[in-house]
A protein has these predicted regions:
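Active-site-proximal region of nucleotide-activated glycan assembly enzymes
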Residues: 2-9, 40, 61-62, 122-131
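Glycosyltransferases and closely related glycan-assembly transferases
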Residues: 8-9, 91-105, 114-128
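Gly/Ala-rich phosphate-binding loop of Rossmann-like dinucleotide-binding domains
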Residues: 31, 35, 121
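Short beta->alpha connector loops at strand-helix junctions that form conserved
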Residues: 65-69, 108, 129-131
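A donor-sugar binding/catalytic signature common to diverse glycosyltransferases
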Residues: 48, 104-108
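Conserved nucleotide-sugar phosphate-binding/catalytic loop shared by glycosyltransferases and other
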Residues: 8-18, 35-84, 94
């Protein structure tokens, strides 16, 4: 992405990057570079301990927590709970995208990425996936 200019305003970018350090830290690196270029960045992380601890070290970044949901491995009644949690995560993502007036969503991989990337796609917002 290019630097903002008088003809190109800063973008509002959401990065879904939580769940594991392998998804989180690349997302943080991308966020830092985008901020340097003048864009507004919101990072979506899971409620996992690794995300909470790491986010404390980056006070200049805007972190939001989204429920981390993984699909049950075998067909069971757990699918009902999964479906409800997935619906709530997508609804949360849609509301957040509206709140921050998102221009683009970057999914860094992992189960935390699906709800915001899906919500952005459904809203016609540009989506990017890195894994």
């Amino acid at each position: 992405m290019t630097q903002p200019s008088p003809t190109r305003p800063p973008l509002n970018i959401v990065i879904a990057c939580g769940g594991t350090g392998g998804h989180l830290f690349p997302g943080i690196a991308v966020a830092q570079e985008l901020k340097k270029r003048g864009h507004k960045v919101t990072l979506l992380i899971s409620q996992k301990k690794v995300d909470a601890q790491a986010s404390k070290n980056y006070g200049d970044l805007d972190f939001r927590v989204i429920e981390a949901i993984a699909m049950p491995k075998i067909p069971s009644l757990g699918l009902l709970g999964f479906g409800l949690r997935l619906y709530k995560a997508i609804r949360f993502s849609r509301n957040l995208l509206d709140e921050v007036s998102a221009d683009a969503v970057i999914g860094m991989g992992g189960f935390t990425s699906f709800p915001p990337v899906y919500a952005a796609h459904r809203k016609g917002i540009r989506t990017y996936v890195h894994d």
